[in-house]
Amino acid sequence: MPMDLRDNKQSQKKWKNRTLTSSLEFALTGIFTAFKEERNMKKHAVSALLAVIAGLVFKVSVIEWLFLLLSIFLVITFEIVNSAIENVVDLASDYHFSMLAKNAKDMAAGAVLVISGFAALTGLIIFVPKIWFLLFH
C-alpha cells in the first residue's frame, strides 16, 4: 500500500521542535549526553579548564582569550559532531563492518585530530612565551 504524503507530513510535524524552548532542550540534552557518554569529551573538558586557568594566571590579552576560547569551543564542537557521526554510522551499519562506515568514522575522527592540533598550536603560541619569560627573566 503506497504511503500518502500527508501521512508523512503529519508524522514529521509530530517530531518537529515547535518552540525555541524545546529546541534548546534537545540541544542541551545532546551536549550533556556527549559529556556523559564520550570519554574524550571528559578529557577535552579537563584540558579546557586547565587552559582557562592558565589564561587567568598569565593574564592573557583579549585577543589571546578569543583564540583560546575559539580553540576550546571548536574542539568540543568537533567532538560532538564526531560522536553524532559515529552513532549514525553504527545505526546505519547495524554494527556490521563496512569499509564505507569505517571511512566515515575515521574521517570524522581525523577532523577532531586536525582541530585539536590547531588548539594545541594556539596554546603553545599563547603560553610558551609567557612561561619562557617567567622561567628566564
Curated annotation (Swiss-Prot):
- What reaction is this protein's catalytic activity? di-trans,octa-cis-undecaprenol + ATP = di-trans,octa-cis-undecaprenyl phosphate + ADP + H(+)
- In terms of superkingdom, the source organism counts as Bacteria
Task: Give EC number(s), comma-separated.
Answer: 2.7.1.66
Q: How is it placed in the membrane, per its record?
A: Multi-pass membrane protein
Q: Which residues cross the membrane?
A: 43-58, 62-78, 109-129
Q: Which residues lie on this side of the membrane: Cytoplasmic?
A: 1-42, 79-108
Xref: PANTHER family? DIACYLGLYCEROL KINASE
Q: Identify this protein by name.
A: Undecaprenol kinase
- The scientific name of the source species is Streptococcus mutans serotype c (strain ATCC 700610 / UA159)
